[in-house]
Regions:
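Short beta-strand-centered aromatic/proline hotspots
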Residues: 542-553
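Residues forming the flavin
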Residues: 1-23, 30-55, 59-455, 498, ...
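Short, well-ordered loop/turn sites that connect or cap secondary structure elements
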Residues: 382, 526-528
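Acidic (E/D-rich), amphipathic helical modules within compact regulatory domains
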Residues: 455-459, 464, 468-507
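Short alpha-helix capping/helix-loop boundary micro-motifs
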Residues: 461, 517-523
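Short, solvent-exposed secondary-structure boundary/capping segments
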Residues: 90-91, 553-565
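Extended Gly/Ser/Thr-rich low-complexity repeat segments
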Residues: 216, 531-537, 569-582
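Short, charged beta-turn/beta-strand-edge "cap" motif at the junction between a beta-strand
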Residues: 74-76, 96-97, 508, 537-542
């Protein structure tokens, strides 16, 4: 396992270590980070064993499954969400372990009273809180993590939003989390897990740090508990080195721990594309992305960003077996096969070797247990939001959270502009639409305009809910009137300033200067000036050669690489590059 020392997007914290004992060894961990990160960075990936003695490691990585439970200073804790701060000893839970019952203290039990209780401080929960607060409705948010933000904290990429006034569009996930949380964190109960819903609309909580039990009495309940990873079945699916995307992404982007440097990704959807891309940013090599369907999933612009890096996407392929290393503490290969309807075709098996991690990105399952029980306790006064109701993008979760806030207000009889509710509802529906292809090829200016001055090409061929590019152009040259249209450049207004290139969340805007044979490409990883490169199209096919002349640094950390092209027939085909020496 590897500690991430440098990152093109994340601001890494100053090193400040604490120490604890693990099986007779002294382990150093970064202050504020989890026990799981410290153990993995020290090379200890096995946290428990099955009843037959097989090694076990992290499974969900977000505190939902209990697979990583260990004894922390004598208490059972989930090490994926337990900080190293103040910890003295960590050890595996013995097979015959039976915790000692401890009488509850005689102190006063806290009972919070509010109008709306929100379970889950992720995108949906925080958006609901923000809107409820704006409407003047008292609320309390409960989350079992040490920081609010949920899945947004794990996301380093820019997000798609279609907005009348720019707020979240083009923002990175972790920045959206901070914005939604706001300056005041009053009414947010962190490190608290909901362990039951009781009669009389009472919610039972337990603080996972102090073990304090408390209650919330609320009139309305919003369940925004997110989702859990779906894990397909294959041989050796339980060995360390096989991790769900949630584990891989959280450890990488929040705990700054890279679980492997030679990655096989399973699942060609948005999660598969983005975790692979983010792993590359953190220093990993992606061997391939395999997909059981006969076509790619997710947004085409997300698939393009990994293809331009030379990462192969293999459709109609399934994972048959993970090949463990000698001591079953990791993987060294995988057996894949061609498939039809997800069934492997005999005789097509092949081995992908020289890997040290399998990144499982095969979807999510709503974590809706509290929503189901909430219906019997709160009746019609329970609401679901985000992935707890429908698996979708963070954009959808935010909009559904806001929609729920308006629905609560209606039930309470509060007056507000109904058009606001309709607008949020429309945006929520639009955010779930599948991208619809509208163009066969990107729009480009005529030959006279192309040779007169620099210009941009927007390689956005599908209509979907995103428009940060329209706010980026200082000349107002980019328009996108609806979620079902594509952005269009008015080349009479465009002056070729390239300010839009780094503001596309899908990295799908490229700049060209035919007079100088120069291309301007968005980059979000370390780039060395003077390097010779192969120029590639959106499929990763080589279409020319060039040299990186200059890297223009940008505040949003999507920089511009100015590349001098050579040996290229059509400059407009260039969408990326691959280093000649890798």
């Amino acid at each position: 396992m590897y500690k991430i020392e440098n990152h093109p997007i994340l601001d890494l914290p100053k090193e400040e270590f604490v120490e604890f004992q693990f099986e007779g060894r002294t382990i150093r961990g970064q202050k504020g980070k989890t026990i799981a990160a410290a153990l993995h960075q020290a090379g200890f990936v096995v946290h428990s064993h099955s009843t037959t003695g097989r090694n076990r490691s992290l499974e969900c990585g977000i505190g939902k499954c209990g697979a990583c439970e260990m004894l922390v200073d004598g208490q059972v804790r989930r090490i994926c969400i337990t900080s190293v701060d103040g910890v003295k000893e960590v050890r595996e839970i013995p097979k015959d372990y039976m915790p000692e019952g401890k009488p509850r203290g005689a102190g006063e039990t806290k009972i919070y009273k509010t109008t709306v209780a929100i379970i889950g401080g992720g995108p949906a929960g925080l958006a609901c809180r923000e809107q409820l607060t704006a409407l003047g409705i008292p609320n309390i948010v409960v989350d079992n993590n040490a920081t609010e933000g949920g899945q947004f904290n794990m996301q380093t990429h820019q997000f798609f939003f279609f907005e009348k006034e720019q707020k979240f569009g083009g923002m990175r996930g972790f920045d959206i989390a901070k914005t939604l949380a706001g300056d005041s964190h009053d009414g947010i109960l962190l490190n608290n897990t909901v362990w039951d819903l009781l009669e009389g609309r009472r919610i039972a909580l337990k603080n996972i740090v102090t073990q304090e039990v408390s209650y919330i009495d609320a009139d309305h309940l919003v369940v925004a508990t997110g989702a859990v990873p779906f894990m397909p079945v294959f041989e050796n699916d339980d060995v360390p080195g096989v991790y769900t995307a949630a584990v891989f992404q959280k450890m990488m982007n929040q705990e700054h721990t890279l679980l492997g440097k030679r990655v096989l990704t399973v699942g060609a959807g948005n999660i598969g594309y983005l975790t692979s891309y983010q792993a590359m940013q953190a220093g990993a090599t992606i061997k391939a992305i395999i997909e059981g369907m006969d076509h790619e999933g997710g947004f085409p612009v997300q698939a393009n960003r990994v293809r331009r890096l030379g990462i192969p996407i293999m459709t109609s392929h399934v994972l048959i077996r993970a090949i463990p290393n000698e001591d079953y503490t990791g993987v060294k290969g995988a057996v894949i096969a061609e498939c039809k309807n997800f069934q492997p075709i005999p005789g097509t098996e092949r081995v992908i070797d020289d890997i040290d991690i399998i990144n499982i990105c095969t979807g999510l399952i709503p974590d809706n247990q509290l929503l189901v029980k909430g219906r019997s306790v709160f009746g019609r006064n329970v609401y679901g939001a985000g992935d707890a109701v429908r698996i979708g993008e963070g954009t959808s979760a935010v909009l559904r959270g806001k929609q729920v806030a308006y629905e609560v207000a209606q039930e309470l009889g509060l007056r507000f502009p109904y058009e606001d509710y309709l607008e949020v509802s429309r945006q929520y529906i639009d955010s779930q639409q599948r991208p619809v292809r509208l163009l066969d090829a990107p729009l480009v200016p005529d030959e006279e305009r192309m040779t007169a001055k620099p210009y941009v090409q927007i390689n956005c061929l599908y209509g979907f809910a995103c428009n940060p590019c329209t706010f980026a152009c200082p000349q107002g040259a980019i328009t996108k009137p609806t979620t079902s249209s594509v952005p269009v450049v008015d080349y009479d207004k465009c002056i070729g300033c390239m300010q839009c290139v780094n503001h596309c969340p899908g990295l799908a805007i490229f700049g060209y200067d035919k007079r100088k044979n120069v291309i301007f490409l968005p980059v979000e990883y370390e780039v060395e000036e003077g390097k010779e490169v192969f120029l590639v199209d959106d499929n990763g096919a080589k279409v020319g050669e060039g040299v990186i002349e200059k890297v223009l640094k940008k505040d949003n950390k999507t920089n511009l690489a100015r590349v001098q092209a050579s040996k290229v027939d059509d400059l407009n085909q260039v969408k990326g590059y691959i280093l000649k020496e890798r």
